[in-house]
From Swiss-Prot:
<keyword id="KW-0143">Chaperone</keyword>
<comment type="similarity">
    <text>Belongs to the GrpE family.</text>
</comment>
<comment type="subunit">
    <text>Homodimer.</text>
</comment>
<dbReference type="GO" id="GO:0006457">
    <property type="term" value="P:protein folding"/>
</dbReference>
<feature type="compositionally biased region" description="Basic and acidic residues">
    <location>
        <begin position="16"/>
        <end position="44"/>
    </location>
</feature>
<keyword id="KW-0346">Stress response</keyword>
<dbReference type="Pfam" id="PF01025">
    <property type="entry name" value="GrpE"/>
</dbReference>
<dbReference type="GO" id="GO:0051082">
    <property type="term" value="F:unfolded protein binding"/>
</dbReference>
<dbReference type="GO" id="GO:0051087">
    <property type="term" value="F:protein-folding chaperone binding"/>
</dbReference>
<feature type="compositionally biased region" description="Acidic residues">
    <location>
        <begin position="54"/>
        <end position="64"/>
    </location>
</feature>
<dbReference type="InterPro" id="IPR013805">
    <property type="entry name" value="GrpE_coiled_coil"/>
</dbReference>
<keyword id="KW-0963">Cytoplasm</keyword>
<dbReference type="InterPro" id="IPR000740">
    <property type="entry name" value="GrpE"/>
</dbReference>
<feature type="region of interest" description="Disordered">
    <location>
        <begin position="1"/>
        <end position="64"/>
    </location>
</feature>
<dbReference type="GO" id="GO:0000774">
    <property type="term" value="F:adenyl-nucleotide exchange factor activity"/>
</dbReference>
<comment type="function">
    <text>Participates actively in the response to hyperosmotic and heat shock by preventing the aggregation of stress-denatured proteins, in association with DnaK and GrpE. It is the nucleotide exchange factor for DnaK and may function as a thermosensor. Unfolded proteins bind initially to DnaJ; upon interaction with the DnaJ-bound protein, DnaK hydrolyzes its bound ATP, resulting in the formation of a stable complex. GrpE releases ADP from DnaK; ATP binding to DnaK triggers the release of the substrate protein, thus completing the reaction cycle.</text>
</comment>
<protein>
    <recommendedName>
        <fullName>Protein GrpE</fullName>
    </recommendedName>
</protein>
Length: 222
């Protein structure tokens, strides 16, 4: 009985260990494509579900994942480059618009100041003859300190100065044809350059604008 059992046990075929072959074309550790190796016909040809051989090698899921990951990284790099270029263009546009706006503000403020000075100049031009009369009265001693007339004159002068109207032209200063009008030239010994010898009519400035030039007598070298 025992011999029969032994005989039956010896007739069973020995079980073969399964052979595992890594057919992935891309090395999962390095990410590089593997070089083709010399394989037997059985290893080169895969049998399809219906038993028919397929000449094309099918990529495994791991290979597809690696390829997909590489494609995604390349796409992300391309998208990032495009985003950086777009950001640089938008920044350049913003800088250009900012510069244009700054220049516009400067022009506007400059024009506004010019118009302001022009408007004030038109208003105070009518007061300049009054200021001339006050100056003559002061020269002749008619503005007695403490009198009502002197008080009014002081207030008027202070008001026009607050508006920015300032007198100019003094005896002894260099003659400048841009701001002085020479009504007479007087040869003077010892004078080496044209100099204001006397101020006949005071000049007035409003900011950078000359409202009226000063009329002067010029001392010239003899």
């Amino acid at each position: 009985m025992s011999d029969q059992n032994l005989g039956q046990g010896s007739d069973e075929p020995e079980r073969e260990e399964p052979i595992v072959r890594d057919k992935r074309r891309i090395d999962p550790e390095t990410g590089k494509v593997r070089e083709p190796q010399d394989l037997s016909h059985e290893e080169l040809v895969d049998v399809g579900p219906a038993g028919e051989s397929q000449g094309e090698e099918i990529l495994s899921d791991d290979d597809l994942d690696l390829l997909s990951g590489q494609t995604t990284a390349d796409q992300l790099a391309a998208d990032q480059l495009a985003a950086d270029q777009l950001a640089a263009e938008r920044l350049a546009d913003l800088q250009r618009v900012t510069a244009e706006y700054a220049n516009y503000r400067k022009r506007t403020e400059s024009n506004r100041e010019i118009e302001r000075e022009r408007a004030i100049g038109d208003a105070v031009k009518g007061l300049i003859p009054v200021l001339d009369d006050l100056e003559r009265a002061d020269t002749h001693g008619d503005l007695i300190e403490g009198s009502a007339f002197a008080t009014i004159a002081a207030k008027l002068r202070a008001s026009v100065e607050r508006l920015g109207l300032l007198p100019y032209g003094e005896k002894g200063e260099p003659f400048d044809p841009q701001i002085h009008e020479a009504i007479f030239q007087q040869p003077t010994p010892g004078v080496t350059a044209d100099t204001v010898a006397d101020v006949v009519e005071t000049g007035y400035r409003l900011g950078s604008t000359t409202v009226r030039v000063a009329k002067v007598v010029v001392a010239v070298p003899a």
